[in-house]
């Protein structure tokens, strides 16, 4: 399928919208009440610091809603305002934040049901309005909705669209796309649907395994088994790893994406030599600015003397998880929560999700005496949620 031609055709359809409806002022008050925070604005103006008795809060200097998320949420609100009585669907969570998605449900936005990991579009009919979330949607989903006669509102982040353009470039020039991402993440599923031949690698360890295979140090059957669910149909590691381009899920850890890119460049240089490198490797730049800014701010924050860290964001949020990884890597006592309600003031306990583990509750959350708390949040977390976490910390510090 010529995905580039399909996108171009879809973008010219009268039933497709990716620019909003000119109703920003009409939804501004609702957005402000639901997601913005006067307290957070005050803390920003005070050098990202708050002192309250024995409590000393340090905010990361970049956190919370990024531009792409703000745009997607605002477009969803505009869509309901523009289509007040039409049946309105969304193909997935608009962003990885439970409170934001709950607000959409309250606005009678229906989420496409999922049965055993497969989306069920049978309830969507001609004339329905369907929102594509910030992560995007697969080209097959777009094609289905277009053929069904739906009105499509596309809130895909432009940074994600940039990655799609990158893998389409790989496909055009018969390069295999090495996608640094999580194979089941909505964004990676969408990106791979625009690629030709592709392979998804989760981390540097998997990338090194692939690089070793390219240089003749691997087992074909083991390779095929390991990446059976992370590659394009019919992928042949002996045929499809000769010409590589690198792309990424925009919310992955920036430093790891860059290292994976350098690894494959060195690998192809070693195998083919400098004169043929450009025929076998395509450089890339698909790292999202907002992801980079939040990670850089987190690295700065964890350099400060902190007693504990609170990271706020959806448990299925990739960019939030990577912020938690940064804190844990520095040995900081850090807690990843998805909503302020995870903190129980009465018992001084917190329900949180450790890395690669299930939810658990921990007592003696806020220690006695002077305490320095670092706070950050993922790109899908509104300021209002951060405010509510800080208010709970203030209450705990007064007990």
Swiss-Prot record:
Pathway: Isoprenoid biosynthesis; dimethylallyl diphosphate biosynthesis; dimethylallyl diphosphate from (2E)-4-hydroxy-3-methylbutenyl diphosphate: step 1/1; Isoprenoid biosynthesis; isopentenyl diphosphate biosynthesis via DXP pathway; isopentenyl diphosphate from 1-deoxy-D-xylulose 5-phosphate: step 6/6
EC number: 1.17.7.4
Residues that, per the record, bind dimethylallyl diphosphate: 96, 185, 317-319, 380
Cofactor(s) needed for function: [4Fe-4S] cluster
Binding site for isopentenyl diphosphate: 96, 185, 317-319, 380
Domain of life: Bacteria
Cross-referenced InterPro entries: LytB/IspH
Cofactor: how bound: Binds 1 [4Fe-4S] cluster per subunit.
Catalyzed chemical reaction(s): isopentenyl diphosphate + 2 oxidized [2Fe-2S]-[ferredoxin] + H2O = (2E)-4-hydroxy-3-methylbut-2-enyl diphosphate + 2 reduced [2Fe-2S]-[ferredoxin] + 2 H(+); dimethylallyl diphosphate + 2 oxidized [2Fe-2S]-[ferredoxin] + H2O = (2E)-4-hydroxy-3-methylbut-2-enyl diphosphate + 2 reduced [2Fe-2S]-[ferredoxin] + 2 H(+)
GO terms (BP aspect): dimethylallyl diphosphate biosynthetic process; isopentenyl diphosphate biosynthetic process, methylerythritol 4-phosphate pathway; terpenoid biosynthetic process
MF terms (GO), sorted A to Z: 4 iron, 4 sulfur cluster binding; 4-hydroxy-3-methylbut-2-enyl diphosphate reductase activity; metal ion binding
Positions of [4Fe-4S] cluster binding: 66, 157, 288
Binding site for (2E)-4-hydroxy-3-methylbut-2-enyl diphosphate: 96, 185, 250, 317-319, 380
Statement: the UniProt record of this protein carries the keyword Oxidoreductase: yes
One Pfam family this sequence matches: LYTB
Keywords for this protein: 4Fe-4S, Iron, Iron-sulfur, Isoprene biosynthesis, Metal-binding, Oxidoreductase
Active site: 187
Keyword Oxidoreductase annotated: yes
Cited NCBIfam families: ispH_lytB, PRK13371.1
Function noted in UniProt: Catalyzes the conversion of 1-hydroxy-2-methyl-2-(E)-butenyl 4-diphosphate (HMBPP) into a mixture of isopentenyl diphosphate (IPP) and dimethylallyl diphosphate (DMAPP). Acts in the terminal step of the DOXP/MEP pathway for isoprenoid precursor biosynthesis.
Family: Belongs to the IspH family.
Protein name: 4-hydroxy-3-methylbut-2-enyl diphosphate reductase
Source organism: Synechococcus sp. (strain CC9605)
């Amino acid at each position: 399928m010529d995905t580039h031609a399909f996108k171009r055709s879809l973008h010219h359809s009268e039933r497709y919208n990716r620019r909003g409806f000119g109703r920003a002022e009409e939804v501004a008050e609702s957005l402000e009440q639901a997601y913005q925070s006067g307290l957070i604005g005050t803390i920003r103006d005070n050098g990202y610091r708050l002192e309250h008795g024995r409590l000393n809060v340090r905010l990361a200097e970049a956190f919370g809603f990024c531009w792409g998320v703000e745009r997607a949420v605002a477009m969803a609100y505009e869509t309901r305002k523009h289509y007040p009585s039409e049946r309105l669907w969304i193909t997935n969570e608009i962003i990885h934040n439970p409170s934001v998605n709950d607000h959409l449900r309250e606005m009678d936005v229906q989420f496409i049901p999922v049965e055993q990991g497969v989306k069920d579009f049978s309830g969507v009919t001609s004339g329905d309005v369907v929102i594509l979330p910030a992560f995007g949607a697969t080209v097959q989903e777009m094609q289905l909705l277009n053929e069904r006669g739906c009105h499509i509102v596309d809130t895909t982040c432009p940074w994600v669209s940039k990655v799609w353009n990158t893998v389409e470039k790989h496909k055009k020039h018969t390069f295999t796309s090495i996608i640094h991402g999580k194979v089941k993440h909505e964004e990676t599923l969408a990106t791979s649907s625009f690629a030709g031949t592709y392979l998804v690698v989760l981390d540097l360890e998997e990338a090194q395994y692939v690089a070793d295979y390219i240089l003749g140090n691997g087992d074909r059957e083991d390779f095929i088994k390991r990446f059976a669910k992370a590659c394009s149909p019919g992928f042949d590691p002996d045929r499809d790893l000769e010409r590589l381009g690198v792309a990424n899920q925009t919310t992955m850890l920036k430093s790891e994406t860059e290292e994976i890119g350098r690894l494959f460049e060195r690998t192809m240089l070693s195998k083919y030599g400098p004169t043929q490198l450009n025929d076998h490797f395509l450089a890339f730049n698909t790292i999202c600015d907002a992801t980079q800014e939040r990670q850089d701010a987190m690295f700065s924050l964890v350099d400060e003397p902190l007693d504990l860290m609170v990271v706020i964001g959806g448990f299925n949020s990739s960019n939030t998880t990577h912020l938690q990884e940064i804190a844990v890597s520095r040995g900081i006592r850090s807690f990843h929560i998805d909503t302020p309600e995870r903190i129980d003031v009465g018992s001084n306990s917190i329900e949180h999700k450790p890395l690669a583990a299930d939810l658990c509750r921990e007592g003696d959350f806020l220690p006695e005496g002077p305490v320095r708390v670092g706070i950050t949040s993922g790109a899908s977390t509104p300021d209002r949620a951060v405010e509510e976490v800080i208010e709970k910390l203030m209450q705990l510090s007064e007990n």
